[in-house]
Amino acid sequence: MSRKVLVVDDEKLIVKGIRFSLEQDGMDVDCAYDGEEALEMAQEKKYDIILLDLMLPKMDGFEVCQQIREFSNVPIVMLTAKGEDMDKILGLEYGADDYITKPFNILEVKARIKAIM
């Protein structure tokens, strides 16, 4: 059975690249482009891991992460351009399991996914 991943980012090219790379590794990938859509998808389906951007339309990644934590322990990796130490600390305090800053190396992202799952 393949691993199910939710990728959440409002930058379509980033989503497309991550999706392609993870699908090459045999993962089943769903995509969301804003915070509300991500939260709905996380409530409707069971994912093995969620890659979550911080700066999203409608609802930011911190809020999405916090709300997902109210009903799920799914691993969440923040994947964001916000690289300040305080942002990283907040992400982890809101319930993220890991925090990767953009620009990122897709091999590092895959390695962290495998380490968490």
Predicted segments, located by residue:
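Active-site residues of response regulator receiver
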Residues: 9, 53, 80
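Charged docking surfaces used in two-component/phosphorelay signaling
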Residues: 13-24
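The feature encodes the CheY-like receiver
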Residues: 15, 57, 84, 102
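Short hydrophobic/Thr-rich beta-strand motif most characteristic of the beta2 strand and flanking loop
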Residues: 26-33, 41
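Conserved phosphotransfer cores of two-component systems
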Residues: 43-47, 67-74, 94
